[in-house]
Amino acid sequence: MKKFDILDFFYIKSQDTQILRYYISKNPTNYGGLSLTNGAEGKTSTMAKSLNTTPTLDTMPMFTEDVCFAAYSIDMQKILHNMKLKTNLEYPGLLFDHEGPDCLPLIKEAYGFVDKSFWVLPGRGKELFKDVKKVR
């Protein structure tokens, strides 16, 4: 198994209290793009296409590694789209870091608020993430 450059990582505490660690890494086998990987199980979802095009349901695979990501891709698309339009970020790693100075204004602009303790996203994402604590 090839080792890819890890750009960022974060922890989530799922609704069943299981703590999982996720990595964002460069993955040249996925269209020269990025991977979101659950280090515990080694499952990977590709984000590559969405970085070079306006994200759509066709180009943004659903994150299925954890129940908390089941409805997250639509919200991810919105944030990625905002970041694509407003920044020249090479990768959306800071998306998962509430303390990331480049990310906070974008999330606040996109959603109107940022909660430092919980993932609070609109629609189905908000419902799924209401009990998901960011424990990094």
Swiss-Prot record:
Provide a GO CC annotation, any one: mitochondrion
Keywords assigned by UniProt, alphabetized: Mitochondrion
Q: Which domain of life is it from?
A: Eukaryota
Q: What is its main location?
A: mitochondrion
Subcellular location per UniProt equals:
Mitochondrion
Q: What is this protein called?
A: Uncharacterized mitochondrial protein ymf33
Q: Which organism is it from?
A: Marchantia polymorpha (Common liverwort)
